């Protein structure tokens, strides 16, 4: 078992596995119920009507959206701090929604098949919180960030060794990240590839 960040940076788990003096859990986000209340009260009705909460859809529709069934579908829907939904509007309307959310300290993360309503938090903020804690006991820290989606790009830009795993939505010539390690294999093989290359780059070997 290893430490991990959940729900686009909303919470950090298991740092005590590295050092027993570190916290077991750090929550950086408000609960999804509070976010939903603000969302429903502050979002213009014309935009709200174009938002479909995935939790309110039929199981068959949920399976189609997430590409998962049974326990894996339950895991995909089990959220404490984020709310997945579909937006049935055009790009102009999506930009208006983004502006409305930003004005109310909320954010929207694109996660492949769905959009996620989030607090004003992201993976960079949680990564920086982890680094700050680790620096209490470690002087030299190198961050390796691995991503396979658009909501990972800012995290990659802020890491020492950025790694990108194949995603057919990406066009590499449009991604401006220095020293990017890229795998043209999809996950999970692509993840193993880039991590191996990243460890070699920083001079780590078994």
Language-model features, listed with the residues they occupy:
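Active-site phosphate-binding/coordination module
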Residues: 1-55
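Conserved beta-strand segments of alpha/beta enzyme cores
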Residues: 3, 50, 107, 179-181
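Short, surface-exposed amphipathic charged segments that create phosphate/polyanion-binding patches used
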Residues: 18-23, 66-69, 197-201
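Conserved acidic, metal-coordinating active-site core of Asp-based
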Residues: 45-144
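Mg2+-dependent phosphoryl-transfer enzymes with acidic/Ser/Thr/Gly-rich catalytic loops
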Residues: 114-206
């Amino acid at each position: 078992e290893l430490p991990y960040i959940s729900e686009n940076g909303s919470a950090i788990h298991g740092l005590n596995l590295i050092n027993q003096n570190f916290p077991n859990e750090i929550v950086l986000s408000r609960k999804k119920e509070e976010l939903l209340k603000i969302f429903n009260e502050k979002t213009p009705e014309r935009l709200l009507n174009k938002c479909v909460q995935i939790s309110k859809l039929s199981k068959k529709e949920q399976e189609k959206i997430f590409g998962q069934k049974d326990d894996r579908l339950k895991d995909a829907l089990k959220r404490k701090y984020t709310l997945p939904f579909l937006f049935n509007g055009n790009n102009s309307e999506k930009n208006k929604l983004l502006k409305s959310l930003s004005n109310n300290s909320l954010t929207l993360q694109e996660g492949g098949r769905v959009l996620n309503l989030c607090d004003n938090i992201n993976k960079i903020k949680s990564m920086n919180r982890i680094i700050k804690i680790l620096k209490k006991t470690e002087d030299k820290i190198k961050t390796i960030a691995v991503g396979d989606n658009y909501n990972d790009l800012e995290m990659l830009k802020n890491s020492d060794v950025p790694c990108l795993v194949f995603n057919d939505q990406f066009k590499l010539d449009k991604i401006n990240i220095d020293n990017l390690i890229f795998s043209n294999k999809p996950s999970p093989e692509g993840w193993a590839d880039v991590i191996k290359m990243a460890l070699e780059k920083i001079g780590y070997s078994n």
